[in-house]
């Protein structure tokens, strides 16, 4: 059986490793701009203006990085 590719984890991990600033759009319309410091199956740890915020993934609509993310899909 071929391993399935988890694009979400690859995308978030590359943003974290590169230190790319990202705008996180929440379902309620609120926007947070910061850096991804970590993530798991349910949450994303975002550093915003030197402070940490733990965001539940079910509250997130979109991640918009300030530059394109390069990662392997195969």
Swiss-Prot record:
It comes from the Bacteria. It holds the Pfam family Hfq. GO terms for cellular component: cytosol. Residues 9-69 form the Sm domain. Homohexamer. RNA chaperone that binds small regulatory RNA (sRNAs) and mRNAs to facilitate mRNA translational regulation in response to envelope stress, environmental stress and changes in metabolite concentrations. Also binds with high specificity to tRNAs. This is RNA-binding protein Hfq. The lineage of its organism: Bacteria, Bacillati, Bacillota, Bacilli, Bacillales. The gene is hfq.
């Amino acid at each position: 059986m071929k391993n399935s590719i988890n694009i979400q984890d690859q995308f978030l991990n590359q943003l974290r490793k590169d230190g790319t600033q990202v705008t996180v759009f929440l379902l309620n319309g609120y926007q947070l701009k910061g850096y991804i410091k970590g993530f798991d199956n349910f949450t994303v740890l975002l550093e915003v203006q030197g402070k940490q915020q733990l965001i539940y993934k079910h509250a997130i609509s979109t991640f918009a990085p300030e530059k394109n993310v390069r990662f392997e899909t195969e």
